A protein has these predicted regions:
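A glycine-rich phosphate-binding loop feature that marks nucleotide/adenosyl-phosphate handling sites
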Residues: 31-35, 267-270, 306-312
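TerminUS-proximal long segments
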Residues: 289-328
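Non-Sec secretion/translocation targeting segments of pathogen effectors
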Residues: 329-369
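Short glycine-/aliphatic-rich beta-strand segments at the starts of folded cytosolic domains
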Residues: 226-240
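A short linear hydrophobic-aromatic micro-motif
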Residues: 258-262
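Extended, low-hydrophobicity segments enriched in charged/polar residues
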Residues: 4-223
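Short amphipathic alpha-helix segments
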Residues: 240-254
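C-terminal structured domain segments
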Residues: 265-303
Length: 369
């Protein structure tokens, strides 16, 4: 079936995979402008309790269907993702209704930042408050529900900002201060990042413990190249924003003993390399662009540049020293950037994925079905 037929099928059948209280739930499929002005189709199943309802994006679900996943499994996976976000769980830190979103005092402790590219988000940034750093934009979001690995969020737009009645500085400081408790910093060698990513699957395949798997993986990864570190958060989701914090910039400089390069691997993490005379900025930039073009999904690209931190002056800047773009300047530039780059070390995150184990999904047959 084509994409439009797929959307119709999902809308017609997804309620069969949900508990009975959802059998008469209203649904809607709307387009949403996401990071890098990527437009996705989002399915919203309105919560019968009147609380916030998550949006499950169908584009990546259709890709899995095209790759051979059974349509019933695809629809079941979408239903799992919905339940994962909507049902209160002990480990979930916050669930609230629509009216509470409008109250700054209620949501302020659950506001967190994300970072994106200014030029690639002209449309999206036209209706949301942001703070510019070099050619990057820090935006602000409310952790609506979910746990650290499955975060449902609401973007703070200009209308909400007006209702809150707080300054940009207040909003920015609140979001930055919340980062450590919402999803703490993770700074480690790239080798350890790869070990952590591969260990679980490898342990299952080989029937060994996680620690044994990690030891075997460490032994198979070459470590004779330059020192490379990964900066993200524990959830490895939208963790690149940590490099925007001045205290984190200084912490990294202290650990590495001086200046360093920052490679924008994706919106989820950055790679850090200590500066050396043998390291060519142009070579790094070429690598960033090539890997981004081949490995990073369009929605997860952060930047086409390489950045640097000067430990003496405590300054973070883009290496080619382009003047900072204002939003109006960015509006006048094409969004067809040369080559979408970046070094991605984390797996692409599919927004409709649930954290439940994969299994064969059978529809829940409600009365009258």
């Amino acid at each position: 079936m084509n994409y439009n037929e797929f959307k119709d099928y999902v809308k017609e059948h997804v309620l069969d995979y949900l508990p009975e209280q959802y059998k008469n739930a209203n649904m809607d499929i709307r387009q949403a402008v996401k990071n890098n002005d990527v437009v996705l189709d989002g399915l919203t199943i309105f919560n019968p309790n009147g609380n916030m309802s998550p949006t499950i994006y169908l584009n990546s679900a259709y890709e899995e269907y095209q790759q051979g996943m059974d349509i019933e499994d695809v629809v079941g996976k979408i239903a799992d993702a919905y339940i994962e976000h909507i049902e209160p769980r002990e480990e979930y830190r916050f669930n609230f209704d629509l009216q509470e979103v409008k109250n700054y005092e209620v949501v302020k402790d659950f506001i967190y930042p994300k970072v994106s590219n200014l030029q690639s988000n002209v449309n999206r940034l036209s209706n949301i408050p942001y703070t510019q750093k070099e050619d990057l934009a820090i935006t602000y979001h409310i952790w609506a529900n979910g746990n650290e690995e499955s975060m449902g969020s609401i973007t703070i737009n200009n209308d909400l900002m007006e209702l809150y009645g707080v300054s940009m500085d207040t909003l920015h400081d609140q979001a930055m201060n919340n980062m450590d408790k919402i999803s703490p910093l993770k700074f480690e060698s790239l080798q350890e990042t790869m070990v952590g990513m591969l260990a679980s699957d490898f342990a299952k395949e080989e029937g060994i413990s996680i620690d044994e798997a990690k030891d075997l993986i460490r032994g198979s990864i070459p470590n004779d190249g330059p020192d490379v570190y990964c900066l993200s958060n524990e959830a490895r989701a939208n963790g690149a924003v940590y490099i925007m914090r001045e205290d984190v910039q200084q912490m990294v400089a202290e650990k590495l003993g001086g200046d360093y390069y920052v490679l924008p691997s994706s919106i989820h993490e950055t790679l850090i390399l200590p500066k050396s005379e043998n390291m060519s900025f142009q070579r790094l930039q070429d690598m960033v662009q090539d890997v981004n073009a081949m490995c990073v999904s369009e929605e997860e690209v952060l930047s086409d540049g390489v950045y640097q931190y000067d430990a003496k002056s405590h300054t973070f800047s883009r290496c080619d020293r382009q003047p900072e773009l204002t939003y109006k300047q960015a509006q006048g530039m094409t969004n067809n950037m040369e080559v979408r780059e970046l070094v991605a070390t984390a797996e692409n995150k599919q927004e409709y994925d649930s954290t439940t184990p994969n299994h064969t999904h059978e529809p829940i047959k409600h009365k009258g079905h």
